[in-house]
Amino acid sequence: MQAIHNDKSLLSPFSELNTDNRTKREESGNAFKEQKGGEFSKLLKQSINELNNTQEQSDKALADMATGQIKDLHQAAIAIGKAETSMKLMLEVRNKAISAYKELLRTQI
């Protein structure tokens, strides 16, 4: 009969590979989470800044119309319409996000 060896040196290369792979997966998973979270927040901030700029242009166009300083009423109307449409879109996106969040809260585990 052959003697059973309790020699762990035979398994050590495999255990090192397993540990290395686990560490790499954890690092890549953390990097993925940070990357995705960062992208969404950047996208959200960028969208809000664009909406703010559009609203400011609309306000300036309205002020120029009120004071008679504007030369092209058509461009002012376009700026105002663009701001109105952008605000409606942002509100709908917000409403959908809130609705999805509420749906998640109702989900039973």
UniProtKB/Swiss-Prot annotation:
Ranges of compositional bias, category Basic and acidic residues: 19-38
GO aspect biological process, one term: bacterial-type flagellum-dependent cell motility
HAMAP family in alphabetical order: FliE
Key words, A-Z: Bacterial flagellum
Gene Ontology molecular function terms on file: cytoskeletal motor activity; structural molecule activity
Domain of life per record: Bacteria
InterPro entries per the UniProt record, alphabetical: FliE
Chain residue ranges for the region called Disordered: 1-38
Name of the protein this chain belongs to: Flagellar hook-basal body complex protein FliE
Gene (name only): fliE
GO cellular component, one term: bacterial-type flagellum basal body
TM ranges: none
Record-stated family: Belongs to the FliE family.
Subcellular location per the Swiss-Prot or TrEMBL entry: Bacterial flagellum basal body
